[in-house]
Amino acid sequence: MKVYNTLTNKKEEFVTLVPGEVKMYVCGPTVYNFFHIGNARTFVVFDTIRRYLEYRGYKVKFIQNFTDIDDKMIKRANEEGSTVKELGDRFIKEYYKDADDLNIERATKNPRATEFMEEIIKFVSDLIEKGYAYEIDGDVYFSTKKFNSYGKLSGQNLEELQLGSRINVDERKKDPMDFAIWKNQKPGEPAWESPWGMGRPGWHIECSCMAYNLLGETIDIHAGGSDLSFPHHENEIAQSEARTGKQFAKYWLHSAFVNVNNQKMSKSLNNFFTAREILEKYDADVLRMFMLSGHYRTQINFSMELLDSTKAALDRLYNSINNLENLLDEVKNEELRDEELEYKNELQKYKEKYIEKMDDDFNTADAISVIFDLIRDVNTNVTIESSKELVKYTLDLIRELGNPLGILQESTKASLEEEIEKLIEERQKARKEKNWALADKIRDDLKERGIVLEDTPQGVRWKQI
């Protein structure tokens, strides 16, 4: 298996610190709002990578944090008239709801930064003691010049960074690029007791501390969105390696941005979507497959038209699964015949090809193509004349390959019936309101999917054709 390591800017053989085990840390959300589709891509990508590693036999300890104390949290809490803790509690709950709806598996642990204050203070104290940090008027800064390899992740030179820095320079700092690891309390802000007075941690130190305490001095994979590479991950490396003298993370993985209608997503451009808004209109499988239809290191463009195309493609997959489920009930032959055994063995090539693609830096786009190829083959060769054993095997194989991607796991019968009944209700409502255009559109859309409606005195019935 090869993974692209941002630290070295090349694909490397994936060799874990302990054979068969993976220690993985992913930077999670700042819990002051619902997460948007850009965040959703990051969460889906690393959920998929975690699932695939488990599929390949690794035992994965997966940590994804909640940032529940920072400037954004404080600003939002003050605007709402709530406490930072109340805000964090609320949006952590909302995160779990949306993540569950998106079929994102629960992490081994989701630590909150505020649960680690004692450990953070110890971390900061150690850095001061080792000469990597200094205190001024209750603020503590990390000295970037003391860490000789600062810039190694982002490939940036410290002197060039200093020259081009647009940061509002605090004249008290020894160097413009030094960053805060502990902040002195300001009026109206939550604070904790420390050797430097009342204050709170800087953002970067929180992740370093949680990773250290939950996974140890060196971890296998540290991951997050590409926007975190600098300065967040660069600063994490500096703090962690300055403290321990050991490599912080062996492999650094970064997922690329989501653009909306070929523009960067932003509230000012009015092209900002939360995952929840999209999940109200589309199933999780659609959003997941869309997010995984491009390589995770490549930017993807989001639009409703592209989601509709993804849904249409996914419907074709589910129609094939539905046909196989129906065949399972209808076929007469129970046991595999000799010629079927040969065909069953031939189907293994799709599993091998899928693994080959996913082993190459988690190429989900090509892996999805393999699933489509498999289903095209099965549609042609698995029929009413096939044995029950072969039909079941093909169904199991499709679901096996869909599982690491978090798609194709539902029984189509239950989900299809639920969706159709919902559309029939919408059509009935449109007819009552004499909205004939909408009623006809719903009927025609269903017909395109192979569903025919029959209006009877007993109500609307439907059947597949």
UniProtKB/Swiss-Prot annotation:
GO cellular component: cytosol
Cofactor: Zn(2+)
GO molecular function, one term: cysteine-tRNA ligase activity
Chain coiled-coil ranges: none
Motif annotated as 'KMSKS' region, chain positions: 264-268
Positions of short motif 'HIGH' region: 29-39
Known catalytic reactions: tRNA(Cys) + L-cysteine + ATP = L-cysteinyl-tRNA(Cys) + AMP + diphosphate
InterPro entries attached to this UniProt entry: Cys-tRNA-ligase, Cys-tRNA-synt_Ia_DALR, Cys-tRNA/MSH_ligase, CysS_C, Rossmann-like_a/b/a_fold, tRNA-synt_1_cat_dom, tRNAsynth_Ia_anticodon-bd
Any single biological process term in GO: cysteinyl-tRNA aminoacylation
Top EC category: ligase
Protein EC: 6.1.1.16
Cofactor notes: Binds 1 zinc ion per subunit.
Cell compartments where the protein resides: Cytoplasm
Binding, ATP: K267
Binding site for Zn(2+): C27, C207, H232, E236
Record keywords: Aminoacyl-tRNA synthetase, ATP-binding, Cytoplasm, Ligase, Metal-binding, Nucleotide-binding, Protein biosynthesis, Zinc
Record text on subunit structure and interactions: Monomer.
UniProt record similarity statement: Belongs to the class-I aminoacyl-tRNA synthetase family.
Protein name: Cysteine--tRNA ligase
UniProt organism field: Clostridium botulinum (strain Loch Maree / Type A3)
